[in-house]
Amino acid sequence: QFDAETMTLHHDKHHATYVANANAALEKHPEIGENLKELLADVTKIPADIRQALINNGGGHLNHALFWELLSPEKQEITADVAQAIDEAFGSFDAFKEQFTAAATGRFGSGWAWLVVNKEGQLEITSTANQDTPISEGKKPILAL
């Protein structure tokens, strides 16, 4: 469970700053477009003078946007399809929770724990530092903490 102060800090300060800084970087190179998912999927296509700013701030925006999208005031049960995929990938839902918790608590400093679909189409748990996003590794994030 999250407290209001932490959520307000992340929404009104952190996320808002990532959006403002990503927009400022993108304004320097309108020719590259504004699709952060596409840009972060191949960071070598981002001009060098704004690359790190977009990795940090574009990643921060995408990471937080997914996090907000996944939040719900009500407990949600997972669908049968998702439960089956988790069982196949991790052995059980309890094993998934243990591995996901380990990814989250094992991250030193700031970062994220992720449930992703990897390049092979399989579920995988991973962790990224700071505002790095698994999109840059060719993975599709589906759960973030």
UniProtKB/Swiss-Prot annotation:
GO terms assigned for molecular function: metal ion binding; superoxide dismutase activity
Cofactor(s) essential for the protein: Mn(2+); Fe(3+)
Family recorded in the similarity comment: Belongs to the iron/manganese superoxide dismutase family.
Gene3D superfamilies: Fe,Mn superoxide dismutase (SOD) domain, Iron/manganese superoxide dismutase, C-terminal domain
Enzyme Commission number(s) of this protein: 1.15.1.1
Catalytic activity: 2 superoxide + 2 H(+) = H2O2 + O2
Cofactor note: Binds 1 Mn(2+) or Fe(3+) ion per subunit.
InterPro entries: Mn/Fe_SOD, Mn/Fe_SOD_C, Mn/Fe_SOD_N, Mn/Fe_SOD_N_sf, SOD_C_sf
Protein name: Superoxide dismutase [Mn/Fe]
Record: residues binding Mn(2+): H10, H64
GO cellular component, one term: cytoplasm
Binding site for Fe(3+): H10, H64
A UniProt-annotated Pfam family: Sod_Fe_C
Function: Destroys superoxide anion radicals which are normally produced within the cells and which are toxic to biological systems. Catalyzes the dismutation of superoxide anion radicals into O2 and H2O2 by successive reduction and oxidation of the transition metal ion at the active site.
This protein's UniProt keywords: Iron, Manganese, Metal-binding, Oxidoreductase
Source organism per UniProt: Streptococcus canis
Protein's UniProt keywords contain Iron: yes
Ranges in a coiled coil: none
